[in-house]
């Protein structure tokens, strides 16, 4: 296929146009007075959201070169979402600012490679300074503040803080849709492990790519299943009962897998197979944990059990199981409470006895899964459109809270970025030439999140930024109440991990963007011309 090639300034301008189209769409959502964006959907009602990464993922531009620019910034939002789960709009705003300031310098003749070096040096200093300012999150109130700021809703903040209190920081919190108009918290004992379905054909919800089994039987074995004959006796009993089945095995492959998939697609029975978590002896222990939680018996030749002889009494039960590509969550297993308590006590004893940090960490993980359980935040709303919007906000708040517990918090509302500017100023004094220009680009870009929050609140961004720069440490602008306050004391905080990831990812993509000198894109295919037109009418008769 023929290609179209653009060079130097023409390339950069086309790419920047794409960056701006995406970033300008996303950045209207930043801050407490940020607006929402409505996204058209092929099926169902449109989605209204303020989630940066959800908006970015929807944007595809017609111009191929502009689209390349947009996709680069989309990568910033996606990567930040993957690492921290929140801060995607902030990351997009920072990337746009670094690209804008950087292109001014490149156009003026600066060397982009040296600019990139300066950007990287400044980001390293900024990240270090953010970590120095970070405060550990310990109280339920601090957790509530982080969640409230992210979701823009105090009630949600309290719910998430309560959920963290119930399951502990190592527990599992999921977000589901409620059948009522209220948003409430439901804590259920459960377990999550990092193994997903062995075949994508087993999903029950194609949009979310997940399989949900309500009230299933659970078969647990430490052997590889490749022959369907081994499973037939127990499968026949399950089909007669009309129940669903979760298989946890070393692997399910070959004839066994294809037969299960075909029968699932035909609707004969509902089955999901997942690989057993862990390796070696740890796998045996984890399978035993799951068995105790669900009231099952691990079918293992070591214990004298054969898969062919398995019956329903050896299978576990749970109220529901959710399996995604990467994880399996078992909720409300029907195991004996006393047996679960004994197992928890046994693991605690092992934690005390072990001298290996790695073993201790793995034992604590198992303990959290057995004792911590699963908290479910059930999101309610009057309409489906509002429900989806609220659900996205709560998922963001949950991610922000986890990030805060992990790495601590800094002053929110863009204040933390402004507060690291003096440290970059010190760095700039030690640099020279175009490397110095690169550091200055970051220094200016760090003002952008605060400026955008002020603009979205209908205020003059430059004035607000200047006032905060000249204020004491941790003093920032409360855009909701339009006043200057100590952000930490006012509970306006951001997770350090979110701020750090946003800056690192924005700088990574933006600095690489500046080094671009040529772009290659497919030429649009030309439509085949139709048959040439025939002359109308009959030839004249003599």
Swiss-Prot record:
Disulphide bridges, residue numbers: none
Function of the protein: Together with its co-chaperonin GroES, plays an essential role in assisting protein folding. The GroEL-GroES system forms a nano-cage that allows encapsulation of the non-native substrate proteins and provides a physical environment optimized to promote and accelerate protein folding.
Subcellular localization(s) per the UniProt record: Cytoplasm
SUPFAM superfamilies: GroEL apical domain-like, GroEL equatorial domain-like, GroEL-intermediate domain like
Keyword Nucleotide-binding: yes
Oligomeric form and interacting partners: Forms a cylinder of 14 subunits composed of two heptameric rings stacked back-to-back. Interacts with the co-chaperonin GroES.
Family: Belongs to the chaperonin (HSP60) family.
Catalytic activity: ATP + H2O + a folded polypeptide = ADP + phosphate + an unfolded polypeptide
Biological processes, Gene Ontology terms: protein refolding
InterPro entries documented for this protein: Chaperonin_Cpn60_CS, Cpn60/GroEL, Cpn60/GroEL/TCP-1, GroEL-like_apical_dom_sf, GROEL-like_equatorial_sf, TCP-1-like_intermed_sf
GO molecular function list: ATP binding; ATP-dependent protein folding chaperone; isomerase activity; unfolded protein binding
Binding residues annotated for ATP, in chain numbering: 29-32, 86-90, 413, 478-480, 494
GO cellular component: cytoplasm
EC code(s) of this entry: 5.6.1.7
Transmembrane stretches, start-end: none
PROSITE patterns: CHAPERONINS_CPN60
Top-level taxon of origin: Bacteria
CDD domains referenced in this protein's UniProt entry, alphabetically: GroEL
Record's protein name: Chaperonin GroEL
Keyword list, A-Z: ATP-binding, Chaperone, Cytoplasm, Isomerase, Nucleotide-binding
Gene name linked to the record: groEL
């Amino acid at each position: 296929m023929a290609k179209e090639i653009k060079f130097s300034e023409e390339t950069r301008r086309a790419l920047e146009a794409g960056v701006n189209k995406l970033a300008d769409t996303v950045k209207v959502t930043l801050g407490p007075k940020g607006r929402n964006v409505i996204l058209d959907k092929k099926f169902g009602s449109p989605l209204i959201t303020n989630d940066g990464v959800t908006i970015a993922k929807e944007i595809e531009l017609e111009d191929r070169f502009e689209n390349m620019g947009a996709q680069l910034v989309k990568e910033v939002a996606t990567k930040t979402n993957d690492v921290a789960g929140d801060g995607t709009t902030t990351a997009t705003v920072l990337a746009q600012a670094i690209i804008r300031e950087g292109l001014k310098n490149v156009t003026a003749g600066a060397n982009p490679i040296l600019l990139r070096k300066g950007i990287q040096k400044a980001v390293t200093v900024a990240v270090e300074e953010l970590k120095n300012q970070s405060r550990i999150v310990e109280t339920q109130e601090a957790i509530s503040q982080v969640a409230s700021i992210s979701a823009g809703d105090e009630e949600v903040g309290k719910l998430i803080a309560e959920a963290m209190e119930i399951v502990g920081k190592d527990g599992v919190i999921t977000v589901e849709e409620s059948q009522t108009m209220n948003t409430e918290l439901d804590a259920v004992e459960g377990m999550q492990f990092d193994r997903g379905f062995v075949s994508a054909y087993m999903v029950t919800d194609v949009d979310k790519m997940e399989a949900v089994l309500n009230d299933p039987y659970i078969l647990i074995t430490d052997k590889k299943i490749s022959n369907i004959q081994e499973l037939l006796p127990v499968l026949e009993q399950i089909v007669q009962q009309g129940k669903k089945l979760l298989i946890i095995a070393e692997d399910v492959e070959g004839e066994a897998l294809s037969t299960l998939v075909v029968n699932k697609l035909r609707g004969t029975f509902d089955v999901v197979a997942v690989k057993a978590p862990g390796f070696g002896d740890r796998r045996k222990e984890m399978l035993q944990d799951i068995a105790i939680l669900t009231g099952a018996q691990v079918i293992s030749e070591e214990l004298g059990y054969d898969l062919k002889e398995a019956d329903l009494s050896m299978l576990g039960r749970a109220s529901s199981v959710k399996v995604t590509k990467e994880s399996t969550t078992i909720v409300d297993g029907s195991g004996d409470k006393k047996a679960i308590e004994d197992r928890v006590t046994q693991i605690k004893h092992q934690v005390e006895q072990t001298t290996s940090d790695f073993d201790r960490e793995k034992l604590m993980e198992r303990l959290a899964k057995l004792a911590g359980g699963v908290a479910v935040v059930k999101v309610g709303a009057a309409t489906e459109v509002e429900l989806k919007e609220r659900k996205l906000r709560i998922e963001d708040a949950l991610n922000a809270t986890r990030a805060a517990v992990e790495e601590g918090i800094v002053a929110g509302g863009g204040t933390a970025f402004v507060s690291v500017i003096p440290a970059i100023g010190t760095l700039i004094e030690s640099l020279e030439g175009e490397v110095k220009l690169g550091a200055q680009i970051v220094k200016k870009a760090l003002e952008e999140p605060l400026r955008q929050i002020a603009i979205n609140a209908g205020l003059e961004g430059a004035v607000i930024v200047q006032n905060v720069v000249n204020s004491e440490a941790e003093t920032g602008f409360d855009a909701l109440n339009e006043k200057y306050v100590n952000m930490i004391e006012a509970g306006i905080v951001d997770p350090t991990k979110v701020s750090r990831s946003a800056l690192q990812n924005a700088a990574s993509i933006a600095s690489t963007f500046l080094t671009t000198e040529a772009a290659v894109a497919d030429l649009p295919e030309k439509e085949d011309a139709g048959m040439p037109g025939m002359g109308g009418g009959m030839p004249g008769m003599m």
